[in-house]
Amino acid sequence: MSRAVRACAAAASARVARSVSNPRWLTTMTDLTLSDSPVATIEAALALHQADRLEEAETLYRRILDAEPRHADALHLLGLIGHQYGRYHEASELIMAAIEIKPDAIYYYNLGNVMQANSRPAAAAECFRLAIELRPGYVDAYNNLGNAQRLAGNARAAVDAFCQVIALQPDHGQAYNNLGNALLDLNEIPAALEAYQHAVALRPELPEPRSNLLFAYHYSDAFDPRAYLDEAMRFDALVTQRAQPYTTWRVDLAPRIGRPLRVGIVSGDLKAHPVGYFIEGMLAHLKRERVELHAYATRDVEDDVTARIKPRFASWTSLASLDDAAAAARIRDDGIDVLIDASGHTIHNRLPLFAWTPAPLQVSWPGYFASTGMRAIDYVIGDRYVMPADEAAHFVERAWHLPDSYLCFTPPAIELDGGPLPMLANGYPTFGYFGKLAKLTDHVIDVWSRVLRDVPDARLFVKAPHLDDSREQHALAARFAAHGIDAARLQFEGRSPRDEYLAAYRRVDLMLSPFPYPGGTTTAEALWMGVPVLGRRGARFLSHICESLLQAARLPEWIAHDDDAYVAKAVAFARNPAELAVLRTTLREQVLAAPLCDAPRFARHFEDALHAMWARRVDAAPRAAS
């Protein structure tokens, strides 16, 4: 066991039972009158609530409060219904009113859950702390405290919280899963993988830890495509065993002549997220007579990007409250021809519902970079760079190549130029990396240190989540120090709003893309800001992404074939400020005119791909509609 996981397990002690019991009996509204005893009435309302008869439960809670306005349990439980309906302000007001009457650990706990759902992790963390003060050893509160701290950017504190859960309840599989998430944030890859493996061993029936394990594998220097695919196929076996796949659909398996393909996209990232950034431009140029889009959001979180793309969909359905069977039934009933998984094994995915085959043709694009392992998914959309023929064995799905890149970048809706080349004023070159710390493997640190040694006056600017924590800064500086790089040559900065983040590119002369997990969105953003990106060719879909984007931006000379070429190119480019200065003023125009940002061109290719896949599906196994 790693030290991080071993430390959690070593503190194991007594288990803590859950505090909320199931209702003992169920009744109907017609059985109740206000003359019933208060205990019986609240238990009846709770029974309705637990049976998911929310409207009836809400009515009864309100009747209780009409008779007894300071009934703390009714206020609290009515707040929970508000939470379930997404009425977060109302929910928090009701639960806070209950707390004012009767401070209770579970009230604070559920108030924390409301704050968490409403994207207020710092407030949520405070609620969970108060719950723990009232009930020491409150396992669920510690677990959710860790989740809130992680979302608030304090992964170190989150690790401590999850370790406390494991100390109280050593077989808490979800806590090990959450611990893995926090360790991954902190770039402790072996410990994260081990935590996920513990979660899978403790809760083998849960898809989430398996997905997280698969996702985390990609950060490891020891990644093995065959081992990854074997694990992905075990995930498929688990979810397929539970599914009841459809074999008939409410669509005609016939050529789509004179009417569009009905295409569903399942995603939790239809927002300010790489998925949102890469589909937004294309959506505006799809021909509705060819493709009719339907969104299936896996979570109810929306923002400005959501507001811009939502009108491009013929329908928008939330799957957040539906289990896989119900979600699959809904999609099938909607008559979807092609269903796209836009998440893969990333967070907020709903891959298990694809095992139900709610659509006759199922595709993975654009939110993942490897095989899902799902036999029910027919194709992965890629391109000749990310899915070369000699890597077909990495997938259970078939490859479908788009003519250019498989991605089309939407330029930010922010008026901001790249500014002058910094090294002209500074007198030295500044390399940059903006992204996750977990991508900075020991191999990357070694190669980048070689670059810095060969350009002795250069600086490296790293901007990453968690680097506003001095402990993380010292840890990263120590890794470079082990290769002889002085901390004075390093500049670290944490997360910032997107406009400030984009402005930070003005302080960089050229970007270094890591490997084997390169920058995707960050590569495109840098190019748009006039900052060229040096990439390294890899040996699987993920490690080819930067290569694909650079080819689509017409910058093939910025792709290195191996470590030595990467170092040589970095040194040569850094010593040629004249060329970098020209790129600074011309690169945005070049990128906007290149396939990388040509949304109309990409939309035609995307439509053609969907219709060609559909034609093959029709030819392969035509079936009558049910």
Task: Set out the residue ranges of the language-model regions.
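Short hydrophobic "strand-cap" motifs at the C-terminus of beta-strands
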Residues: 266, 434-435, 463, 493
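Alpha-helical solenoid repeat scaffolds of the TPR/TPR-like class and their adjacent stem/linker regions
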Residues: 2-428, 446, 478-485, 492, ...
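A short structural motif in glycosyltransferase catalytic domains
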Residues: 514-516, 535
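Short alpha-helix at the nucleotide-sugar/activated-sugar donor binding site of glycosyltransferases
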Residues: 526-528, 551
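Short glycine/serine-rich donor-binding loops of glycosyltransferases
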Residues: 522-523, 546
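Short acidic/histidine- and often glycine-rich active-site loop of Leloir-type glycosyltransferases
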Residues: 543-554
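A conserved nucleotide-sugar
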Residues: 290-292, 449-482
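Substrate-binding clefts and catalytic carboxylate motifs of secreted carbohydrate-active enzymes
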Residues: 432-443
